[in-house]
């Protein structure tokens, strides 16, 4: 019988292991029930991940023919690693149903199915994107990027695409505004105790806000002149909560209707300024510059990835 360790240590797209399993299963079906069940469980997880990917926009920041190929292969490997060991419990249930009269080895003692929420899938995706960007962006261009900008983009790329799909706000605009308002995550608003507020979009705490707030000194413009003023800002428990509130703010307020229906991220940036999101008279231009920088990053990642695809595995 093929050992599980040998089977699961191989790459998810290793046809040799699958052919070996097929041959052995034909010779001794009973002895190979568990490896086959593991493969079925892996296929189930792959289908789950594929369904999640199909629900996302296909024109993301890092989306290209090559990155979609990489993501597909990556998902296959994730599915195989998720089903290693006790896995999700699906394989053991199939083994029990197929061999009801035979006691299971100690290894297969039933366990509660492992919880695997969407946030964990997102975390795997963020790690993959971060590694991809770290390896693919050329060194001379990499030096011009501030701080942990690549990690910042990787962390927000998938949530921004989901938010864009739900709200209509261009995802490049979401990323650009978060980067501009927070200094690529390095100058985000802090609470009084120094902890992060997760307020990536500089949303102020108006009278209808019932959540926690923090007061800081910020720059506002009056008649084109910059002034330092005290202002209260909303505090969130996570970046995802901040993103959700930001999307709600734009979609529920009629004055931002032109933002949610903008044909491009650049048009959305101008619509934000026209709607009075910020007092900075150059807000739209700053956002547009940030959007162009992100699109340039996307192009460089795609081109470099296509030339060095073998080095990324």
From Swiss-Prot:
Presence of keyword Cell wall biogenesis/degradation: yes
Entry keyword Ribosomal protein: no
Superkingdom classification of source: Bacteria
GO biological process: bacterial-type flagellum assembly; bacterial-type flagellum-dependent cell motility; cell wall organization
First-level EC class: hydrolase
GO CC terms, sorted: periplasmic space
EC number: 3.2.1.-
Active-site residues (renumbered): 220, 245
Pfam families cross-referenced by the UniProt entry: Glucosaminidase, Rod-binding
Cellular compartment(s): Periplasm
More details: Probably exported via the flagellum-specific export pathway.
Family note: In the N-terminal section; belongs to the FlgJ family.
Name recorded for this polypeptide: Peptidoglycan hydrolase FlgJ
Species this chain originates from: Escherichia coli (strain K12)
Upper taxonomic lineage: Bacteria, Pseudomonadati, Pseudomonadota, Gammaproteobacteria, Enterobacterales
